[in-house]
Amino acid sequence: MHMRIQKLNSDTKKNLLEDLLKRSPNNYGQYEASVKEILDKVKEEKDAAVFAYTAKFDGAELTADTIEVTDAEIEEAYAQVDDTLLTVIRKAKDNIESYHAKQRQNSWFDSKPNGTILGQKITPLHRVGVYVPGGKAVYPSSVLMNVMPAKVAGVDEIIMVTPPGKNGKVSPNTLVAAKEAGVDKIYKVGGAQAIAALAYGTESIPKVDKIVGPGNIYVALAKKAVYGHVSIDSIAGPSEILVVADETANPRYVAADLLSQAEHDELASAILVTTSEKLAHEVSDQVDGFLKELSRAEIISKSLDNYGYILLADTMEDVIDVANEIASEHLEIQTKNPFEVMTKIRNAGAIFIGEYASEPLGDYFAGPNHILPTNGTAKFFSPLSVDDFIKKSSIISYSREALQKVHKDIESFAKAEQLTAHANSIHVRFEEED
């Protein structure tokens, strides 16, 4: 198959943006009733509902004695994991931990000679729930990316949920990654029922303060539904890559990077925006060549048919404009002056600069988080970070002398808003002086 090559203009841009928005989890209202039923059932029946849904959807029979992963199961997992993979998991964990450690914030206080103390107190969340997908694809990298920022932030307790196989077991790779990352408890439950258990609590699974981690449409809608009852990270949509390139880019590298995202699922988007017609055709040819060698060629072909684009722009300014409008989850810059282009990018989840910063480098190993905003939400959301696992409390302390100097100003403000009890709360401290 050949990727479609189109001239970038107002019509093609409009059609592209409309196509991408169709992939949003907000457009799956037909699933909401099913999700609500699951949430309500778990809220009411707790463990019994969790066990029933796990049997129905995953084919695994769980009890209060088997829902939590045991130390023996973790030891068994280590025996099954390849030594090379274990070494790589540990290296990646160190990189992720080192990167996120730089995001730490300290509490601060600003004191004045007049007795005024203002500040901000940083407090880690108490308990966090991490959702890790299961099924055919197993993602130990997602375990590390969700857990390490929470560990760096100082979260007291990290609970992980992940769906079991029909044998009632969890992938060894997932268990080993969880142990290496420092997860405190692991439960064999997935889907909307897992989100409900974390949000409301059951006899076996404790209620958490925040839920993070990607999942299918049922998980996404369940997270959306419990938001406000608990905090969540974001509503993850299908994966996206946008490559910005000029005539200096290597077409083989660009094609390989586009395919690396198209293989996720049929809703994934892979887009090249370039000023070079020669590169556009070469990339399309390279995609055809690679497809013959790849194990997920059928998924990739459907993904590219639906959401694969090569757009030809007149100028690099046009390329940058459309990149900022798309606000892609992953943005690669393969141009003559990539850092110069980077300074003009306002909207992107993660920015990969230069031809050797391939997107999978960020997925697995470099250190920055791979939990990124999708569906254009990079215009206002950020990657998962240490900030997602802390709270900030304002600190205010005034001496009598400090308050005395401003109390009439405060009273005037309160009276202007007709909040006389507010004014009185200040006035009563100085009423003997008036």
Predicted features and spans:
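Conserved NAD(P)+-binding/catalytic subdomain of aldehyde/semialdehyde dehydrogenases
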Residues: 182-253, 257-260, 264-269
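C-terminal core of ALDH-fold dehydrogenases
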Residues: 325-434
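Short internal beta-strands
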Residues: 156-166, 270-276, 354
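Conserved small-residue-rich beta-alpha loop and adjacent elements
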Residues: 110-176
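N-terminal Rossmann-like NAD(P)+-binding subdomain of aldehyde/semialdehyde dehydrogenases
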Residues: 1-126
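Alpha-helix C-terminal capping segments
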Residues: 145-156, 179-181, 199-205, 223-225, ...
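Short loop-to-beta-strand entry elements in the cores of soluble alpha/beta enzymes
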Residues: 212-214, 234-245, 261-284, 300-311, ...
